[in-house]
Every structure is written in structure tokens, then in C-alpha cells.
Amino acid sequence: MFVDSMEEHKLWVIVPAAGVGSRMGGERPKQYLKLIDRSVLEHTLDRLLSAPGISQIYLPLHPQDKWWPEIADKYTGKVISVAGGEERSTSVLNALEKIESHAAIEDWVLVHDVARPCFRISDISNLMRLLWNTQPGGLLGVPVADTVKRTNEKGEVLATVSRANLWRAYTPQMFRFGALLSALRQGSEKGVHITDEASAIEAQGLKPVMVEGHSDNIKITHPQDLPLAEIFLRRIMQEEE
């Protein structure tokens, strides 16, 4: 069984949640907005903790986060909060450095967006299964289906971009502990623009593996995303029953 083979290298899980979600509007960050019966953050944490092989999560939070204490007790021993940074990459790096003294360089780190509660447990299991014996790791994504245009600064179309081998990058993303720690540290030192963990790994000349997931694993970014996420999440949870 695959889960049994995970004993050789430990899996560490990080959910960066220090963002303020300015595009959603309002005072409450998007991860604390209600989705069905609980917050977006709670759905994400609860679903991750129900996945095989995941028993603990590191959660980088904004220093002035006043909402986490309201729900922290239910995650005692399961979720460890750490100081988040202004950038996602800084938050993940802070968590890695918190873990560093306990981790081996060949351990795995799985990073997931807090605002993506609509993932499938089966997709995480598939990601782990396909990447477990690879270097340096990879990520979930879906092939680009829409026609893609390149424009100039005026919005005028310059060209139609071929969709061949183009993917939309999602999370979770999973990489070897040592490789990700080194990539984020060097990226920070060199001022590299890091949009996700895969981009940090790519900047090191390494080639992450893309694993196909589902397009309904959306990131809640704008107000109109919440009702759509509710539809997707209800359907996914029903499928998983």
C-alpha cells in the first residue's frame, strides 16, 4: 500500500494564510469568510487533515491576525501557527525554517493555498503517489483549454499563443524539503520574483513534474468566487461520501 511506503520520508504540510485578501473587499480576510457551514480556512484545514498521510499542518499567519484565536482550539496538536511574511514565499520559508531542525533534506513538503478548499482528496493521493520517488517534486494543474492571446500595454492583440503544453498551475505543490528550502532562500537573497513554490524550484534550473488535477480546484480571489466554490465543494464532498 502506498501510505505504508511513506514511512521512509516524512511529509510536512504548509498552508500559507498570512494574506489580507484585499481583492475580496471588506475587513475580514478571505480565508475567514463563511463557506457553507464554516470558514474557508476551516474547510481547507479539515479536508487536508482527512487526507491519508497528513496529520499535522504548519500555518503561517499575519502578525495581526485576530480571527485565528476564535477557532484555534479545535486544531490543538494538529495545526501549528508560525509567523507569516508580506509575501507568500516568505511565509513558506518561515515555516520551513521552523521545521528545519526536525526534517531531513529528502523529506517532502506539501504546500497548499488556503483559499483552495475545493480540492479532491484523491488528487492529493495521486500527487503523492506519482511524485514520491521523483526529484525534485511537482504540482497539480490542468491543461489550458481556452484560447490564449498576447497583447501590448494598450490591450491590443499581438498574437494567439499556442496552447500546446500550456498548463494552469494549482496547488498542492510538493517538493523535497532540502530543494525547496534552498530554492526559497536563494530566491529571497537574489530578489527573484517567486509566484509559487514551483517557480522557485524552476529558478534553480530544476524541472517540476505537472500532475493533472481538476479545474474546479479554484482559488477564491474575488467575491463572486464564493458562491461558485460552494457549488463545487458541495458536489465534491457528496462524491467523497
UniProtKB/Swiss-Prot annotation:
Keywords: Isoprene biosynthesis, Nucleotidyltransferase, Transferase. One of its GO terms (molecular function) is 2-C-methyl-D-erythritol 4-phosphate cytidylyltransferase activity. The record marks 163, 219 as: Positions MEP for the nucleophilic attack. Pathway: Isoprenoid biosynthesis; isopentenyl diphosphate biosynthesis via DXP pathway; isopentenyl diphosphate from 1-deoxy-D-xylulose 5-phosphate: step 2/6. Pfam families: IspD. It is an enzyme of class 2 (transferase). Its EC number is 2.7.7.60. It comes from the Bacteria. SUPFAM superfamilies: Nucleotide-diphospho-sugar transferases. It catalyses: 2-C-methyl-D-erythritol 4-phosphate + CTP + H(+) = 4-CDP-2-C-methyl-D-erythritol + diphosphate. GO terms for biological process: isopentenyl diphosphate biosynthetic process, methylerythritol 4-phosphate pathway. Gene3D superfamilies: Spore Coat Polysaccharide Biosynthesis Protein SpsA, Chain A. The record marks 23, 30 as: Transition state stabilizer. Catalyzes the formation of 4-diphosphocytidyl-2-C-methyl-D-erythritol from CTP and 2-C-methyl-D-erythritol 4-phosphate (MEP). NCBIfam families: ispD. Belongs to the IspD/TarI cytidylyltransferase family. IspD subfamily. This is 2-C-methyl-D-erythritol 4-phosphate cytidylyltransferase. It comes from Hahella chejuensis (strain KCTC 2396).
